[in-house]
Amino acid sequence: MSIFIGGAWPYANGSLHLGHIASLLPGDILARYYRAKGENVLYVSGSDCNGTPIAIRAKQEGVTAKDIADQYHEEFERCFRNLGFTYDCYTRTDSEHHHETVQNVFLRLLEEGHIYKKTVEQAYCETCTQFLPDRYVEGICPHCHEAARGDQCDACSAILDPLDLLEKKCKLCGSTPSVQETEHFYFALHTFQEQIKTAVENVKQTGTWRDNAIQLTERYVKEGLQDRAVSRDLPIGVPIPVEGYEDKKIYVWIEAVTGYYSASKHWAEKTGEDDQEFWDSEAKTYYVHGKDNIPFHSVIWPAVLLGIGEGAIPRHIVSNEYLTVEKRKLSTSKNWAVWVPDILERYDPDSIRYFLTVNAPENRDTDFSWREFIYSHNSELLGAYGNFVNRTLKFIEKYYGGIVPKGSIDVELKDKVEGLYKHVGEAIEQTKFKVALESIFDAVRFANKYFDEKQPWKQREDNPVSCEETIYNCVYLIANFVNLLEPFLPFSSERIRNTLSIVNRNWESQHTLPSRIDSVQPLFERIDVKQIEHEVEKLYGAVK
């Protein structure tokens, strides 16, 4: 089976925060799982280097947009690598290959009659003497009356036209823009109304889109899909490939989502592989992002794919809700955020991955609390999982000289483990990652109970053969926890693999156990709870 996984592209205008990771982490869990299953996986993403936020940041700092994009693209790559993300291709939207692919898609849509020219009114700043891209216009949402940008309202998820905003202001200088006529290209989104409606009806039956994606897309369909501009007067971006319009750029809402396609083509070019199987209707596709990106993946991207004749419209939409920080809405402008480069300097990446999975905002907003983060590490990763692994391997090291005793696998344990592979696998495929991880940790707690009830420290004296059986079965459980937890906790899984010399990474019950173990080191270190107060003080102290 061909599995395509697309992770949303973060804007390269500032550091990643935990809200980004909470929405993107499911993509890596899926990729690791399906590779272990032996499926053909293509997992792609990249940095959005063409967006208006980058141009604004560059203007504020007095540097070029490329300077900003380079800085954060490199930081993103480093953060994703240090968090264990296993992208097959992580690229950027200001690359030549991306520009070429996007222009080709634009021309195909134009040739098929899905793009047309239209004279429209657009916000123009007399002070800055320029037409204003949508994100350069800020004001009040006409639907919910909250503060909004010219392209979208984060409060109610409405896709907006800048001229719809109330109390419009230029983001650059704060003046009220005028309205002038200009010519732009438009995407005939309304012509895909019935196909998008059918797609939503289908996923309501299969349950392969998150509820928030279904509800929001149904709302758009009910209101009637509106044609959208595909060109803008932007300072950076992909030039319109039509003579006489080269000074205009392809609008980022269609250009950025086409990044999945351009990354796929770039991967194929680099590896010599054929990527077409990932764009056929039989492909199993997952798009992983936050709920603010839903309409771009549930309406616009499917319409673009249909418009160019590709069959792989999004089968799974993994659109997480929002992550708050210490019960407050995350705000980058106010510096109310936990920044990824910062937390990675001091904490185990598996601790971050664990907390953002068991506490994932899958169906509702959830909160990142330093207290909960540190206590979950100490109680679950260290106290449950680390404790079981350490007490078993230390027992072998102390009483068997590092040689794993001989034994036979308990039938009940074998059935439990094989059932766990099936249950966890199904949960991952259904994008129920929290359920999957909690199921494994239920088994970890069962394993600790098994160790306690068998009391190998007593068996060793009273019944050495039973002791060997107990320890052998504990090693069997550890070897399988390593595989089951690989998609979630890859770093600790790798450490145990090295200790036990486990080579097999397949998603199946491990029956061949190691004969000996190498030097045993603690799997996790205890975090001093005094860190809670320190981290909270640091967070409040950084607020602007």
UniProtKB/Swiss-Prot annotation:
Origin: domain of life: Bacteria
- Look up the EC number in the record and give it: 6.1.1.10
Residues involved in ATP binding? 332
Q: Where is this motif: 'HIGH' region?
A: 10-20
Entry GO MF terms = ATP binding; metal ion binding; methionine-tRNA ligase activity
Question: Is Zinc one of the keywords UniProt gives this record?
Answer: yes
Which keywords fit this entry according to its UniProt record? Aminoacyl-tRNA synthetase, ATP-binding, Cytoplasm, Ligase, Metal-binding, Nucleotide-binding, Protein biosynthesis, Zinc
Give start-end ranges for motif 'KMSKS' region: 329-333
What enzyme class is recorded for this protein? ligase
Q: Which GO terms describe its biological process?
A: methionyl-tRNA aminoacylation
Q: Where in the cell is it found?
A: Cytoplasm
Q: Which GO terms describe its cellular component?
A: cytosol
Asked whether the UniProt record includes RNA-binding among its keywords, one would answer no
Its recorded reaction(s) are: tRNA(Met) + L-methionine + ATP = L-methionyl-tRNA(Met) + AMP + diphosphate
Essential cofactor(s): Zn(2+)
Q: How does it assemble?
A: Monomer.
Q: What does this protein do?
A: Is required not only for elongation of protein synthesis but also for the initiation of all mRNA translation through initiator tRNA(fMet) aminoacylation.
Recorded protein name is Methionine--tRNA ligase
* Organism (species): Bacillus cereus (strain Q1)
